[in-house]
From Swiss-Prot:
Lumenal domain ranges by topology: 35-77, 135-136, 183-192, 256-327, 401-470
Species whose genome carries this gene: Cricetulus griseus (Chinese hamster)
Keywords tagged on the record: Endoplasmic reticulum, Glycosyltransferase, GPI-anchor biosynthesis, Membrane, Transferase, Transmembrane, Transmembrane helix
Record localization: Endoplasmic reticulum membrane
Family the entry assigns: Belongs to the PIGV family.
Pathway(s) per entry: Glycolipid biosynthesis; glycosylphosphatidylinositol-anchor biosynthesis
Protein name: GPI alpha-1,6-mannosyltransferase 2
GO annotation, biological process: GPI anchor biosynthetic process
Transmembrane segments: 14-34, 78-98, 114-134, 137-157, 162-182, 193-213, 235-255, 328-348, 380-400, 471-491
Amino acid sequence: MWSLDPSQKEVLRFAVSCRILTLMLQALFNIIIPDHHADAFSPPRLASSCSVDQLVEGLLGGLSRWDAEHFLFIAEHGYLYEHNFAFFPGFPLALLMGTELLRPLQGLLSQRSCLLVSVALLNFLFSVLAAVTLHDLGCLVLGCPRQAFYAAMLFCLSPANVFLAAGYSEALFAFLTFSAMGQLERGRSWASGLLFALATGVRSNGLVSVGFLLHAQCRGFFSSLVVLNPLKPLFKLMASLCLSVLTVSLPFALFQYYAYTQFCLPGSAHSVPEPLVQLAVDKGYRITGGNEPPWCSWGLPLVYSYIQDVYWNVGFLRYYELRQVPNFLLATPVAVLVVWAAWTYVTTHPWLCLTLGLRRSKDSKKTLEKPHPGFLSPKVFVYLVHAAGLLLFGSLCMHVQVLTRLLCSSTPVVYWFPAHLLQNQEPLLRSVDTVPEKLLEKNSPPGQKAPRNCIMKLLYNWRACSPVTRCILGYFLTYWLLGLLLHCNFLPWT
């Protein structure tokens, strides 16, 4: 059982409140706003529904839009269609485990209704745990409890809010990734590697996280390097690097092999319900046991690359079309945030960035850069490289509107840097003592003015906030609410 300090309790309280409000608003929007008829994956319902199922659909149906339908379909029927393999198995497996806990209700609810309830409960849990874990990670990396607290509170109002609540894998991925980062900061590389591997089983961009393990191992190598006998540590480093890569990439490799067995090996056909076969015929989906797809004959038969290319038209600069300008505008705020963060950090620590943060420990006595707490801490370097790499790849090779949920569920930088700006440029947060570890308890003196929730303090005093604070909170709150309004009704917010 965790022992939570006052700041962690406040993060937990605010995260739970935001999750409850999110579920209530998505239900309201789902009921009062008619769904847009989008050209999205919509498999037929095989089981009959009763009045209780219709109630669940009305209350939680907003969580099943767009890609969530794929995850729900996979959890219910498995990987029947080729394009289902764009969605990794970690989250569907979690949904299946959630439905097992709901087994007593399965006589009352259909399988789909149980899955919807599982989505709501599990992503509620994962999002709250991710917020608490981000706070813990911030304390370890930033060395500034105040910024760690602000960042965790901002995560509760994430621009990717709807994707942390809906039937998407972002909440689970964020929890696993932040947990892995925290374990690595504590020096527990094996636990970190296992968590990063689990994250890779949830989302493909978990593969990039191997960079954290590689950087930590290289940093340790250079800090303890013995010039007279470097070969033994070098061989040990190479073995450790290879093991890290294998560990983190293993779930991806196993998933690709499973796809190969389903589509490329004889005798892999399964019994598929007729309505789902008809859907494949009508939509042109390739189904297991059908004709062998072209990727089976590749030297490295990766179904994931094929699907992204053929089904989603993902590739270098393919999204750079005039009609995609609105999607580029949607992704602009988070892109500006990361670029601004990178520029601020690089101009503060040019030498640290040039040496890739791999200075030997004995050099630390030299004033290569001033020690900074908070976002400008030398420890943040590898996190910033990770965020910048995701931004660069996402901007050039992905559907650019995905950048918001990609970055907001993968990197703490999009929360640390706004927290840094709030601390340094918001007078309201400097006017009273709001250091998280000194947050008031119920028995605090009545004359004390320090607020329990810094975000609510800023919202209550919106007109007195600085322009930077208004931009940050305006962006977070607008996307938090607008995403719910649009996504839950099949409107274009993906």
